[in-house]
Amino acid sequence: MNLDKCRSIVFALAMGGLFLAALFVLLGGASPVARADPGSLFISPTGSGTECSQANPCALQTALSLANDGDILYLAQGTYTGTGAAVITLTRSITLYGGWDGAPSGPVTRDPAAYPTVLDGERARRVVYISGDITPTLDGLIIARGNATGLTEGCPTSSGNPDGCGGGIFAYGAHPLIVNNIISDNVAALTTAGYPTGTTGYGGGLYLRDADRAVISGNVVISNVAGAADCGNGGGMFLFGAAEGARIEANRVLSNYATTTNMSCAWGGGISGGPGGALIRGNLVEGNWSNAMGTGYGAGLYQWYGAAHYVGNVVRGNRGRRAVYLGYSRSCFEGNWVVDNLTNEGLQLYNSIDGGPTLINNVIARSGGTTFAAYGHVAYPLTATLLHNTLVGSGSGYGVYVEDYVTLFLTNTIVAGHTWGITSTYPTSSTIFADHTLFWANAHDGLRGTNPIDGDPRFLNPAAGDYHLGPGSAALDAGVDAGVATDIDGDARPMGAGYDLGADEAEPSYRLYLPFIRSPIPEDL
């Protein structure tokens, strides 16, 4: 994917965001009062009857059966269970708000932290099922202990026989707004049989299929498992099929497993995506595992086909073979921090079709023996473009490792702290075009390309994961115009006499510096 296409995706998603922002304002306006609005239904774990008023709340299933498109359901504190395949089934565009204080009169007050509302699958069923061309909202709920074993509707079939998808939330062909929830302790599949004829679980916490315009924002997705006894794909969440305009933003995706076994058929401990063009922005993806032995693919992020846009995410402390894996991808990977992962490789690209990926303004650091790797195939040669990236090792391994059938363009790159800086193991079938690369503290720089620079980048505090450029950095004003107008923090390029190398454009001393973790991750998550 070229830079112009990356820009067009950002513009289209930004315009879609204006509509969604306006929608959130409408949904989050003044609180309705007791049953004066006929579209408000009130629910409690001990509710009864069909009045569903603030003074006389009803049961959850009663309210769901009475609700019409546009209605708002307020759920009081407590635990709600269900029967059958799911705790709740949504086929209308309604809103479910957790955290209602249960007051029988007066203004409706919500505080999900003070009045936790739990939808409990009891490890016996999926928690939430959403289907159809609808736009429901889930806000302020705890979605827990779901189990989708045997629920194979809408599951992929390419990685063994499916045996369950979406333990916490399953959405197929819908456009849900899933915001400010805790999605915890769910499993997509428990069955064991063995890959490739066996079973695969998809999306332990959340599964979206053909969910264009979906919004998944401000959630904590924690301790979910895709495949508890066999192959697994997407421990935290799995995105599949058409997802144009879908937005996965400002979530905390923590301590999820693609599979809890030692099997290598493990893809995407945190977030896994298939074909589609979702925006995945500003998420913290931390402490996830691809499998129990730390192998598998994409411990933090995994993409297989598609053209997603990953921007401003923090991927750290994940365990597996690669922290980020993009296969057959045309994605834009921009402004991300991939740091301190317990992996063999920080980021790997694998094959390409209909154009390749573009990486802009990323920091990939201390995430295994190889910081960046690229692999192609004679039938699917990989072409990739890297602009303004900072690649830092732990004193050993490879900075850039290229296998066969790869064409790689590197511009304004920092490569520091490796045994080998840039290397190609198959120079007869692969080509690396490196221009304006800063080399530092590598035992062997390897392929230096054109206009190489030697010198200390003077990162501000690399021991603490801060790879912003400090005073006297050899990267200052040493680059070339690569068509990149901002840096990893959104600051303008250039700020000095020329373009700085790597992901950061150093700010003038009079401007306030903020540590990197505060930029991509909202403080209110």
Which residues fall in each region the model found?
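Sec-dependent, cleavable N-terminal signal peptides
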Residues: M1-P38
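Acidic Gly/Asp/Thr-rich repetitive segments characteristic of extracellular carbohydrate-active
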Residues: S44-T81, A86-V87, V127, D489, ...
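Acidic glycine-/aspartate-rich tracts in secreted/extracellular proteins
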Residues: T46-T50, D71, Q77-T81, G99-G106, ...
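Extracellular beta-strand-rich solenoid/capping regions of secreted or surface-exposed proteins
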Residues: Q61, S65-D69, T81-T95, A103-G140, ...
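C-terminal accessory segments
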Residues: A124-S131, T135, T450-E505
